[in-house]
Amino acid sequence: MTRRAILKGTGSALPRTRVSNAELAERVDTSDEWIVERTGIRFRHIAEPDETTATLGADAARRALEAAGLQPADIGLIIVATATPDNTFPASATKVQALLGAPDCIAFDVAAVCSGFLYAVSVADAMLRTGAARHALVIGSETFSRILDWNDRTTCVLFGDGAGAVVLSAEDVADDRGVLATRLHAEGRYCDMLYVDGGPSTTGTVGHVRMQGREVFRHAVTNLAAVLGEVMRDVGLSADDIDWVVPHQANKRIIDATAKKLGLPADRVVLTVDQHANTSAASVPLALDLAVRDGRIKRGDLVVLEAMGGGFTWGAAVLRV
């Protein structure tokens, strides 16, 4: 028997307001054709003032708990991956805990931008396997609309708000269910290629997203293909063994180029970027939840998750559902 972190449930939440490219073009110098051609994005959800990273994360968590057949009191660990917390402190994870009515447990945030959910899964996996908790909520939640420069069409058209969550539970299993391997990387010398130009210890302001798009694209395709190869080799798998890839939903061109580099057919890649845009740390769990709920991802499927974000940070995980 081997102790592993088993996927017990998924959930997601989106803000009430959905904005099309055409609607965005009414306030930004852009067009539907320009956005779709370069990104594949058609819609994004934008949070209203009463919708925050914590409230969206809590909504996604409730749905994941329901899918897992668990109550908030069962949870011993809450990790929220976010680059847009409600406050500098306390951690959004503690606010989610309060919103859920969960009792005393471990709760903290992880900040690795778009890779945050992969980092959080890796941390939760290690903590569950070593007995720190039996059940964990791992959440990616973002309100990136709060840090966008709406006069910069190269960035503001790319992002949306939302949340996704999974329940992972420690179980002793005889088969290969659960999280089988994770791989994480960071290369800080590229931190000025995708960043926010503000912060409490530098400007005292929130700041806005800034990006060197061409460089991000180049590094993303190379790094994501490499880390997917690494994590599959860790468990002795090839592309032919994978049932589904759930990639970070940043840009359809990046997703397509990465899949092509690995020899993965498009019909095995979960794609939601057209409906949600780039929701940063929320994108992978949000896409995972949709694919589970619509029946594409089924029990027994081998699923690979991958993401890259500012820093640069990047990572991948492979799990048997």
Swiss-Prot record:
Q: Which GO biological-process labels does this protein carry?
A: fatty acid biosynthetic process; secondary metabolite biosynthetic process
List the GO molecular function terms.
3-oxoacyl-[acyl-carrier-protein] synthase activity; beta-ketoacyl-acyl-carrier-protein synthase III activity
Pfam families in the record, alphabetically?
A: ACP_syn_III (PF08545), ACP_syn_III_C (PF08541)
Which keywords appear in this protein's UniProt record, sorted alphabetically?
Answer: Acyltransferase, Cytoplasm, Fatty acid biosynthesis, Fatty acid metabolism, Lipid biosynthesis, Lipid metabolism, Multifunctional enzyme, Transferase
GO terms for cellular component:
cytoplasm
Tell me the Gene3D superfamilies matching this sequence. 3.40.47.10
EC code(s) of this entry: 2.3.1.180
- The active site lies at C114, H248, N278
Name the enzyme's class.
transferase
Coiled-coil portions:
none
Location of the region described as ACP-binding in the Swiss-Prot/TrEMBL record: 249-253
Job of this protein? Catalyzes the condensation reaction of fatty acid synthesis by the addition to an acyl acceptor of two carbons from malonyl-ACP. Catalyzes the first condensation reaction which initiates fatty acid synthesis and may therefore play a role in governing the total rate of fatty acid production. Possesses both acetoacetyl-ACP synthase and acetyl transacylase activities. Its substrate specificity determines the biosynthesis of branched-chain and/or straight-chain of fatty acids.
Q: What is known of its domains?
A: The last Arg residue of the ACP-binding site is essential for the weak association between ACP/AcpP and FabH.
Q: Which family does it belong to?
A: Belongs to the thiolase-like superfamily. FabH family.
- The molecule here is called Beta-ketoacyl-[acyl-carrier-protein] synthase III
Query: Which lineage do the record's taxonomy fields give for this organism?
Result: Bacteria, Pseudomonadati, Pseudomonadota, Alphaproteobacteria, Sphingomonadales
